[in-house]
């Protein structure tokens, strides 16, 4: 029995399902989830001392790779001064200033402790600002596990086949209107019918929780125009794409300014953190300036600020995101070549340093329906074959993959060698 098997059995005694987030349970791919004990650079090491090239990156935050020495030094330094104050710190202001400098649409920022908290708060703010109740989200897009957003959600909810989680009152769900991602006409038709009731549209500019689906040309620009036409607040959920697709996020890459944005993952450098922000006119409605209440005991935690500030400064160097995107491109080209050589139907998608893998004969991946053409059973076999070859992919056919600046030629070769063997075994 492996160490991971023993630990997983023990974990299930007091932790529901043995994990603290559903996708970690390997329910989609089968087998025993790996328990990790160490991570450095592009690698993670499990409890049985096997090392893997990591394309999960803690689900996105580890853009520098694991255990970057500068980030560790920043955290160690802050440890000497305390873990949490529950009071303002200079680092909170530094973080707000830096986020507003890097992201085109940000004029004011509120720090929180998670991406879910950020999206939940942004939606409450949009409702308070507009005086409207309804929101529009997109099929397969995941914005955290708050009640109003667990309607036709992606991520773990998609993996588990739960379109609307039990425990969400119908009275909550009725205000959440869902339309297909990348279908601008569906949004246009819905707003023509109920636009006066809609407070906001929330969208992942790159849908990263039904694998990785970039926006169709003109789609985000079309959403911006429709929101302007109907007086609807446009929210970009950049918890995943922020500072990864480009330094200024997907909104900078696609040149579209939302009214509000949410961030997480990278801004904490691996620590639990999130933020939301945007137009001063809207953000001034948040307490204590305005009547929309939002608060958090650990918001702006100094350890998270130290790790996040260091991370953002390091990724701000010229050429960083070009290098990250180039590695991702070479990875996907190499995988595609090897799949083609093996006669395996296979499609990839990319947005900067994030990517999607699909065992599908679709000509392109644009919609939720395209995503669902992917052969989940074949991905399951591929996942375990890659694990055997020393490569750790996201344990679900519906999750995006992530690269880091620590991935280089050696990791690329190891990955492609493992993939060549895996594709051959899938014939």
UniProtKB/Swiss-Prot annotation:
InterPro entries: 4pyrrol_synth_GluAld_NH2Trfase, Aminotrans_3, Aminotrans_3_PPA_site, PyrdxlP-dep_Trfase, PyrdxlP-dep_Trfase_major, PyrdxlP-dep_Trfase_small. Pathway: Porphyrin-containing compound metabolism; protoporphyrin-IX biosynthesis; 5-aminolevulinate from L-glutamyl-tRNA(Glu): step 2/2. Gene3D superfamilies: Aspartate Aminotransferase, domain 1, Type I PLP-dependent aspartate aminotransferase-like (Major domain). It catalyses: (S)-4-amino-5-oxopentanoate = 5-aminolevulinate. Its main location: cytoplasm. One of its GO terms (molecular function) is pyridoxal phosphate binding. GO terms for biological process: protoporphyrinogen IX biosynthetic process. Transmembrane segments: none annotated. Its cofactor is pyridoxal 5'-phosphate. It is an enzyme of class 5 (isomerase). Its EC number is 5.4.3.8. GO terms for cellular component: cytoplasm. It is found in: Cytoplasm. The modification N6-(pyridoxal phosphate)lysine is found at residue 265. Keywords: Cytoplasm, Isomerase, Porphyrin biosynthesis, Pyridoxal phosphate. Belongs to the class-III pyridoxal-phosphate-dependent aminotransferase family. HemL subfamily. HAMAP family: HemL_aminotrans_3 (MF_00375). Homodimer. This is Glutamate-1-semialdehyde 2,1-aminomutase. It comes from Pseudomonas syringae pv. tomato (strain ATCC BAA-871 / DC3000). The lineage of its organism: Bacteria, Pseudomonadati, Pseudomonadota, Gammaproteobacteria, Pseudomonadales. The gene is hemL.
